[in-house]
Amino acid sequence: PSCSSEEIFPAENKEITMHEYEKLVKTAYKKGDKRLALIIETLGSTGIRISELRHITVESLKYGMADLHNKGKVRRILYPSELLRILREYVKEKHICSGSIFITSKGNPVNRSNVWRMMKNLCRDAGVSEEKVYPHSMRHLFARSFYKIKNDIAKLADVLGHSSIDTTRIYIKTTGKEHKRQLNKMKMVLGTRLREGWDVM
């Protein structure tokens, strides 16, 4: 069966961009919601699932890494240096001595519905389309950013905790516009330059 263009190239209005990610983080800080800003930065810089935020604990900050338990497997993620610094500042400021860092007013770890609701509200203030913000949107952005730098899908699959690389491929699909930009950079069509007298010898 043939594939539609939507299946080959994801819609541009469905994936959050780095610029929009920055707008969300900056807006959260400006609103005084440091917890939400740090949640977004943690998701964006580590690629973890929202459901795995509970494993980001005060204790894990001592080692600069966290062990994530999911579906009977353990995955170790490392904290970027800057994230580690600001998380340590945050727990000190909020007097969080142990356990999960991102908690509700009742002291429970934030869950998927909590975070999704907060992000949707933030979108309106930041001027970012709500359609682009869904539970895995920051994870997708992390995957695309990591792959652009590392260009190693097997390593990315390990970082994301995917048992199949086929799942990882979904995360790093480029839009039609990005793909066309890459094709243009290849400069494999020589006709115009030849007609303009480009010396090929």
Please identify what each model-predicted range represents:
Residues 1-12, 25-30, 65, 93, ...:
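N-terminal core-binding DNA-recognition domain of tyrosine recombinases/integrases
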Residues 1-23, 72, 103-108:
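Flexible interdomain linker/hinge and immediately adjacent N-terminus
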Residues 15, 71-72, 160, 165-185:
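Catalytic-site neighborhood detector that most strongly recognizes the C-terminal catalytic loop/helix
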Residues 16-46, 50:
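Basic, Lys/Arg- and aromatic-enriched nucleic-acid-binding interface segment
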Residues 41, 45, 139-163, 170:
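C-terminal catalytic core of tyrosine-transesterase DNA break-rejoin enzymes
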Residues 43-63:
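Short, charged phosphate-coordinating catalytic segments
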Residues 70-89, 99-120:
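C-terminal catalytic core of Y-nucleophile DNA break-rejoin enzymes
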Residues 187-201:
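C-terminal secondary-structure termini that scaffold catalytic or DNA-interacting sites
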